[in-house]
A protein has these predicted regions:
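Residue-level signal for well-ordered, solvent-exposed loop/turn and beta-edge residues enriched
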Residues: 52, 114, 132-134
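Short loop/turn motifs at secondary-structure junctions and domain boundaries
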Residues: 34, 117-118
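A short, acidic/glycine-rich surface segment
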Residues: 11-12, 85, 108-113
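Short, low-complexity N-terminal intrinsically disordered segments enriched in polar/charged residues
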Residues: 1-49
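A solvent-exposed, acidic/Ser-Thr-rich amphipathic alpha-helical stretch
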Residues: 21-22, 27, 40-97, 102-104, ...
């Protein structure tokens, strides 16, 4: 069941907005740290069951657990994978309790013994579902 941020009065909106932003920020950094573990199950647990993933290194839109698993099985297999978040901006939807976070990150990994550096931009949507912040949308593309 999807839970939104509480529908606050004008006086409490700022506090509620800050709490929502803090939850989404923590979820974003948890995602980056979990990617570095290269544990597919742990990464997938950060996504809502109906989340949409438009991944960095694939042209296929992933909209179910099996398709997201297929992508992360391949992506997380890269040796030494880390994700460094450089910049992000965020906003809270006043109606839906959804937090949108967009920014820039860099993936670094080794492929065939050669270090690969992939600067990318991202857009995540997070929602509080069953008392945890989950990814409901994730778009990532290589920087132009």
């Amino acid at each position: 069941m999807t839970e939104t941020c509480p529908n606050p009065t004008i006086e409490t909106y700022a506090d509620t907005e800050l709490a929502c932003l803090a939850g989404a920020k923590a979820a974003l950094y948890r995602w980056a740290a979990t990617v570095a573990t290269r544990d597919v199950d742990q990464v997938l647990a950060l996504y809502a069951p109906d989340a949409i993933l438009v991944p960095t290194l694939s042209n296929q839109v992933r909209d179910c657990d099996d398709s997201r698993r297929n992508y992360f099985d391949n992506f997380l297999a890269n040796d030494g994978l880390v994700c460094d978040i450089q910049v992000f901006k965020k906003r809270v939807s006043r109606k839906l309790g959804t937090v949108v976070v967009g920014g820039l990150y860099t993936f670094v990994y080794r492929q065939a013994g050669v270090q690969q550096v992939v600067p990318a931009r991202f857009l995540f949507t997070f929602e509080r579902i069953d008392d945890q912040w989950l990814i409901t949308g994730h778009h990532s593309s290589i920087e132009a």
